[in-house]
Amino acid sequence: MYGFRLCRPCRCGCKPATPPRCPSAVTVTRCVTSARVNQYISGPNGSGKRPAYWRRSTCSAWQLSSFRSQRLSPVIQHEQPACTVFGQVLWNDGRVRNLGVARNRLGELQIRIDGQNVRSAAQLAESLPLQLINPDSFRLLEGAPKVRRQFLDWGVFHVEQRFLPAWDRLQTALRQRNSWLRHGRIDPVSQAAWDRELCLRRSDSELLRAGRERCSARFLLLPFRAISNWGIPRRPQRADRRRRLARTMPRTCCRAVTRSWWSVRLKIAQGHLVDRARRECIYLVDDLPSELDEQHRRALCRLLEELHCQVFITCVDLEALREGWRTDTPVALFHVNRALITQPTIGSEGNDRKPTYDSSSIKS
């Protein structure tokens, strides 16, 4: 298993500067008992790549438990009550932010930012915007509407400051409304209160529509078409956006590689929006060659280089991504094999690999 780390060059166009790092410490997560790695994190999970993404994603937000399961148990090491992840984000302007997340098997979550306890995972996500591109991400166009709603919500969350309060109030109104429906008919007083709150949330959503349109259409060749409205039967929690080509859905008329490429471009478009908002976004790209051919892989490398962001990419075939970058792009290569992480020289055949990390606490 190989991993590429694309360093972040200086924005002014001069020679590459030292990229912002995200050093991390891991305590009793699955496959790793205790580890401290600077710049790049990896550990074995079958092939050895996914535990790295578990831990780095946790530094951004506890948005998932496992890439293969929605349960929490696959993340926590066997016979351990909890797992803990620490991260340190170093920004280009010299600011340092310390992040910490701990969660036990009962589901209790503790988040600390700069030594202070925080209650909302949104504060953690705001501290480190992170985009994940993996085989599941390629189903953005053909998956359930919930996937596309989450995609748009992520972009607006990092661009529009008004989004989170409006979204929270809308979710509260929907929970109250659903609770009333489960207990029978809604009395006129409760119905009027709920309608008034939903109308306010509709007003907020109209103000945020411009942000959603930028997330869905900017930097793309074809726009999305909203197929939902605020009436019955489609309500805001049932909203969806689909893309049409010659009045036909792409999932029925386009090749799989084309659909995957459109999904990737949507992710890249969100990176541009975050960048315009003066934020830093990190990309985690898992098993890229499995979904994109050589032409599209090279195109993705160019798009990532234009973003000037920090990127972590894994692949099984070293040659599949070795030639994708420009010669002036700083790239670090890591090889993972049986809990041993080595850093071979770019362009070498792997005979003189220098070990960079070998922890006896990692369990194969």
UniProtKB/Swiss-Prot annotation:
One of its GO terms (biological process) is DNA synthesis involved in DNA repair. ATP binds at G43, P44, N45, G46, S47, G48, K49, R50. GO terms for cellular component: cytoplasm. GO terms for molecular function: ATP binding; single-stranded DNA binding. HAMAP family: RecF. The RecF protein is involved in DNA metabolism; it is required for DNA replication and normal SOS inducibility. RecF binds preferentially to single-stranded, linear DNA. It also seems to bind ATP. This is DNA replication and repair protein RecF.
